C-alpha cells in the first residue's frame, strides 16, 4: 500500500469543509489511493476518517481586519504556513492536492502549484468563497457542489465540473430511510441545529416560538435540538416548563441518523447541511447565516427552496411568531411535508464523492 499514489486533502478545520474531504477520502482509499489531511488546529474536534497519523497541521489565518497590522499578521501566518506546506509536499510527494475551501487551504494549494503538483479545488457553496476565488485561476481543475458556477465564472468554465457535494457514508446509509410523514394527531419529530459550530439564534428563537404553539400541537412535538453549552440552561428551563418531549445536546455525532428520523428540520443552510437534507430527502426551514460577505448560505438555501424542498427565512424575519406560524401550517399539512421531502430528494447527489474521485483521478493522472 506504501507504493499507492498519495492524494493530499486540504480543508479548513470545520465540519463544513472536513466532512466532504472525509467522504472523498473514503472513496479514494477504496480505489487504492493513500490519503492524508492538511488542515488547521480546529480539526482535532472532529472525529472521523483522519487519525492523528494521517493529519498534518499547517499554520494559517483568516483575514480578520483591513488595518495594515491585521493584514501583515495574516500575510505572515499564511507565508509561514506556505513554507511549511512546501517542505511537507516535497517530502510526501503527493500525486495531487485537493482543496475544500477556507483560508487553511491556501498554504498547501499554493505550495503545490509551486511544486508543480496537480491541483484541484472543490467549492461546496452555491457561490464561490474568497479562498477558492483566489485559487481558481491557479489550479488545474475546479469541482462544484451546485450548478451555475460556470455561468458566474465563464473564464473558468473549461475547468469546472459539477460533481455535487460529497456526503459521508453515514449520510448515504440514512438516505435509504424513506420519509415518514406525521399522522393526523400523531407525533411530529422536529430536528433543530445550527451547523457544526452551533447557532445562538436557534436558542433565541425556537423556545419562544414553541411557547406560542397550540397546546395540542405542543403535546405532539418530539424535539431534538443542538444547543451550545452556554445556551443550555436557559433553553432547558423553557422546555422543562412546557413539559416538552425533547433531547438537547451541544453536538450530535449521529446527525445523519437523526436527520433520517426527523419529519421537519430547522437549521442553518451551510453547503453540507443542504447537501445532506437533499440526499436524505427531508423538508426544511432554512435560516441563512447573515452578514457573510459572499452570502453563501442565502444562495445555498435558495437552491433547495427553488426546488420546493425548503422554506428560506432570512434571520431578521426569523421571529418566534413566524416560526410558530410555519410549524403550525406544516404540521397541519402532511401532504405538503411529503411533497417537500420528495422535492429535496430529487436534487440530492448520492454519487458526488464518486464523481469527485473521478475528477481527482483525471487530474492526478494515476
UniProtKB/Swiss-Prot annotation:
Binding annotation for UDP-N-acetyl-alpha-D-glucosamine: 14-16, 125, 168, 196, 297
GO MF term set: UDP-N-acetyl-D-glucosamine:N-acetylmuramoyl-L-alanyl-D-glutamyl-meso-2,6-diaminopimelyl-D-alanyl-D-alanine-diphosphoundecaprenol 4-beta-N-acetylglucosaminlytransferase activity; undecaprenyldiphospho-muramoylpentapeptide beta-N-acetylglucosaminyltransferase activity
Enzyme Commission code: 2.4.1.227
Location of the protein in the cell: Cell inner membrane
Keyword Aminoacyl-tRNA synthetase: no
CDD domains, A to Z: GT28_MurG
Catalytic activity: di-trans,octa-cis-undecaprenyl diphospho-N-acetyl-alpha-D-muramoyl-L-alanyl-D-glutamyl-meso-2,6-diaminopimeloyl-D-alanyl-D-alanine + UDP-N-acetyl-alpha-D-glucosamine = di-trans,octa-cis-undecaprenyl diphospho-[N-acetyl-alpha-D-glucosaminyl-(1->4)]-N-acetyl-alpha-D-muramoyl-L-alanyl-D-glutamyl-meso-2,6-diaminopimeloyl-D-alanyl-D-alanine + UDP + H(+)
UniProt KW Transferase keyword: yes
A matching Pfam family: Glyco_transf_28
Membrane topology label: Peripheral membrane protein
Keywords: Cell cycle, Cell division, Cell inner membrane, Cell membrane, Cell shape, Cell wall biogenesis/degradation, Glycosyltransferase, Membrane, Peptidoglycan synthesis, Transferase
One GO term of the biological process aspect: cell wall organization
Pathway: Cell wall biogenesis; peptidoglycan biosynthesis
Gene3D superfamilies membership: Glycogen Phosphorylase B
The organism's place on the tree of life at top rank: Bacteria
Residues passing through the membrane, by range: none
GO cellular component: plasma membrane
Top class in the EC scheme: transferase
Function recorded in the entry: Cell wall formation. Catalyzes the transfer of a GlcNAc subunit on undecaprenyl-pyrophosphoryl-MurNAc-pentapeptide (lipid intermediate I) to form undecaprenyl-pyrophosphoryl-MurNAc-(pentapeptide)GlcNAc (lipid intermediate II).
Family statement drawn from the similarity comment of this UniProt entry: Belongs to the glycosyltransferase 28 family. MurG subfamily.
Name of the molecule in the record: UDP-N-acetylglucosamine--N-acetylmuramyl-(pentapeptide) pyrophosphoryl-undecaprenol N-acetylglucosamine transferase
Protein source organism: Rhodopseudomonas palustris (strain ATCC BAA-98 / CGA009)
Amino acid at each position: 500500500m506504501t507504493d499507492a499514489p498519495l492524494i493530499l486533502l486540504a480543508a479548513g478545520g470545520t465540519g463544513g469543509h472536513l466532512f466532504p474531504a472525509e467522504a472523498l477520502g473514503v472513496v479514494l482509499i477504496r480505489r487504492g489511493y493513500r490519503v492524508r489531511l492538511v488542515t488547521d488546529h480546529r480539526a482535532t474536534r472532529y472525529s472521523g476518517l483522519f487519525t492523528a497519523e494521517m493529519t498534518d497541521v499547517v499554520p494559517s489565518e483568516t483575514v480578520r481586519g483591513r488595518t495594515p497590522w491585521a493584514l501583515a499578521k495574516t500575510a505572515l501566518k499564511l507565508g509561514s504556513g506556505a513554507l511549511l506546506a512546501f517542505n511537507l509536499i516535497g517530502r510526501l510527494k503527493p500525486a495531487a492536492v485537493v482543496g475544500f475551501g477556507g483560508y487553511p487551504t491556501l498554504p498547501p494549494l499554493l505550495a503545490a502549484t509551486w511544486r508543480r503538483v496537480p491541483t484541484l479545488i472543490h467549492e461546496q457553496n452555491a457561490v464561490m468563497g474568497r479562498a477558492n476565488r483566489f485559487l481558481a485561476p491557479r489550479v488545474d481543475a475546479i469541482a462544484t457542489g451546485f450548478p451555475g458556477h460556470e455561468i458566474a465564472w465563464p473564464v473558468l468554465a473549461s475547468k469546472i465540473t459539477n460533481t455535487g457535494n460529497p456526503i459521508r457514508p453515514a449520510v448515504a446509509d440514512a438516505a435509504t430511510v424513506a420519509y415518514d410523514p406525521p399522522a393526523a394527531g400523531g407525533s411530529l419529530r422536529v430536528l433543530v441545529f445550527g451547523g457544526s459550530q452551533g447557532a445562538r439564534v436557534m436558542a433565541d428563537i425556537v423556545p419562544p416560538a414553541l411557547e406560542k404553539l397550540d397546546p395540542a400541537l405542543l403535546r405532539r412535538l418530539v424535539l431534538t435540538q443542538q444547543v451550545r453549552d452556554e445556551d443550555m440552561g436557559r433553553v432547558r428551563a423553557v422546555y422543562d416548563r412546557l413539559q416538552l418531549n425533547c433531547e438537547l445536546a451541544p453536538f450530535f455525532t449521529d446527525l445523519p441518523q437523526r436527520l433520517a428520523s426527523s419529519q421537519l428540520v430547522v437549521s442553518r443552510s451551510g453547503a453540507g447541511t443542504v447537501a445532506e437534507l437533499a440526499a436524505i430527502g427531508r423538508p426544511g426551514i432554512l435560516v441563512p447565516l447573515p452578514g457573510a460577505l459572499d452570502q453563501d448560505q442565502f444562495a445555498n438555501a435558495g437552491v433547495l427552496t427553488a426546488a420546493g424542498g425548503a422554506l428560506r427565512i432570512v434571520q431578521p424575519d426569523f421571529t418566534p411568531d413566524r416560526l410558530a406560524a410555519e410549524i403550525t401550517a406544516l404540521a397541519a399539512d402532511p401532504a405538503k411535508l411529503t411533497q417537500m421531502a420528495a422535492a429535496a430528494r430529487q436534487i440530492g447527489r448520492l454519487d458526488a464523492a464518486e464523481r469527485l474521485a473521478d475528477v481527482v483521478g483525471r487530474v492526478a493522472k494515476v
